[in-house]
Regions:
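Cytosolic, long alpha-helical scaffolding segments
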Residues: 1-161
Length: 161
């Protein structure tokens, strides 16, 4: 049981780390845009914000599935992932339409697409987290009162670190 718990925790941890990496990518891309003296249009920012808000919702749902052990949440997360993909496709098409109308800069197309792609990958990681709930992985709470003294010392030492 402990080995399964450890493996599940590693999967969740790995996916959270990947989400953090994608956040760094988004931050780096946006800084690159600003460093080049360019700005995203208000419409582009609104589209990206909608995608990021949905991704944030997905992350919350995924973590809730792990915390509660709700095995139905992964299906909800997968449905929301489809909504994110639809938002991202719409955002990409809207960007190209703005480029045609000269309300967005063509040179930002690659960076804008990369921003959308990073959010898509975050959503994939959220699904992987939620799927751990299907495997009955949940964060067990430690019962400190019933632990032996060595375990209690380790828990207290960890809490002080």
């Amino acid at each position: 049981k402990q080995a399964e718990q450890a493996a599940g925790l590693m999967v969740v941890s790995n996916n959270i780390e990947r989400i953090a990496d994608r956040c760094d990518e988004v931050d780096g891309l946006y800084k690159k845009i600003l460093d080049n003296g360019q700005l995203l249009s208000d419409a582009a920012i609104a589209d990206l914000t909608a995608c990021m808000d949905m991704t944030e919702k997905l992350f919350g749902e995924s973590m809730n599935a792990i915390i509660t052990g709700d095995s139905e949440t992964p299906d909800k997360v997968a449905a929301d992932k489809k909504k994110i993909r639809k938002l991202q496709r719409q955002a990409g098409k809207a960007h190209l339409a703005r480029v045609k109308k000269n309300t967005c800069v063509r040179s930002l197309t690659a960076d804008y697409s990369a921003l959308l792609y990073s959010m898509d990958r975050m959503a994939d990681n959220c699904i992987s987290i939620a799927e751990e709930a299907i495997d009955d992985f949940t964060f067990d709470k430690l019962d400190i009162e019933n632990m032996d003294s060595d375990s209690e010392v380790m828990v207290k030492a960890g809490a002080q670190a």
